[in-house]
Amino acid sequence: MIIHNLGIKDYTEIWEQMKEFTAIRDSNSYDELWLLEHYPVYTQGQAGKPEHVLNPNSIKIVQSDRGGQVTYHGPGQLVAYVLMDIRRRNLGIRTLVAKLEEILISVLEHYRIPANIRSGAPGVYVGEKKIASIGLRVKNGCTYHGIALNVNMDLSPFLGINPCGFAKMEMTQMSHFHPNIQLEEVSQHLVQYFLTQFK
């Protein structure tokens, strides 16, 4: 597993790089985890519906090829893209999603933030509020896209959409519990728990 820390990047640029990496990889290619933040952007998943974008203002909307519905990415949100050969690892997509949820819950528990999952609504929640999203694409047995964890960001753009297709879905973030939390530190813990699950 190769870990890349990419800083803050344009969504479309990284999306193209993920598709290119997945297209040219072979059975000997290492799996990779890309850690980054994005400039403000709304992304529509394959199941996304235009009516779930309520008020985009000046934020760009990108029609993506990941699973799921609409979400928002912006600075202060930790994004981890999972470029993994799940066929080689004998992993089903549902098992992978469950493991990613476990990793996110472990990170949050490290900070004593009580997290949970909800049946039929992938992602991780604190009470009824969503703190992390998951959206993947599988091509030729390999995944790309991944997870987004709200660390210390401006949550107001989420008010312009129905996050993940749920009207009135409230969002939260780690800084509500730890005002001085640093994204870089959270990223280190996420990598630690990720490598515990996936050697």
UniProtKB/Swiss-Prot annotation:
Provide the E.C. number(s) assigned to this enzyme: 2.3.1.181
Protein name per UniProt:
Octanoyltransferase
Molecular function via GO: lipoyl(octanoyl) transferase activity
Domain (BPL/LPL catalytic): residue spans on this chain: 27-199
GO BP annotation list: protein modification process
Residues bound to substrate are: 66-73, 133-135, 146-148
Which UniProt keywords are given for this protein, alphabetically ordered?
A: Acyltransferase, Cytoplasm, Transferase
Q: What else is known?
A: In the reaction, the free carboxyl group of octanoic acid is attached via an amide linkage to the epsilon-amino group of a specific lysine residue of lipoyl domains of lipoate-dependent enzymes.
Q: Does this entry carry the keyword Protein transport?
A: no
Catalytic reactions on record: octanoyl-[ACP] + L-lysyl-[protein] = N(6)-octanoyl-L-lysyl-[protein] + holo-[ACP] + H(+)
- CDD domains named among the record's database cross-references: LipB (cd16444)
Q: Where is the active site?
A: 164
| A Pfam cross-reference name | LplA-B_cat
The top EC class is: transferase
Q: Where are the transmembrane segments?
A: none
Q: Which residues form the signal peptide?
A: none
Give the UniProt entry's GO cellular component terms. Answer: cytoplasm
Cell compartments where the protein resides: Cytoplasm
Main function: Catalyzes the transfer of endogenously produced octanoic acid from octanoyl-acyl-carrier-protein onto the lipoyl domains of lipoate-dependent enzymes. Lipoyl-ACP can also act as a substrate although octanoyl-ACP is likely to be the physiological substrate.
| Residues carrying the site annotation Lowers pKa of active site Cys | 130
- What InterPro entries does this protein's entry cite? aa-tRNA-synth_II/BPL/LPL, BPL_LPL_catalytic, Octanoyltransferase, Octanoyltransferase_CS
Asked if the keyword Acetylation belongs to this entry, the reply reads: no
Spell out the family assignment given in the record's similarity comment: Belongs to the LipB family.
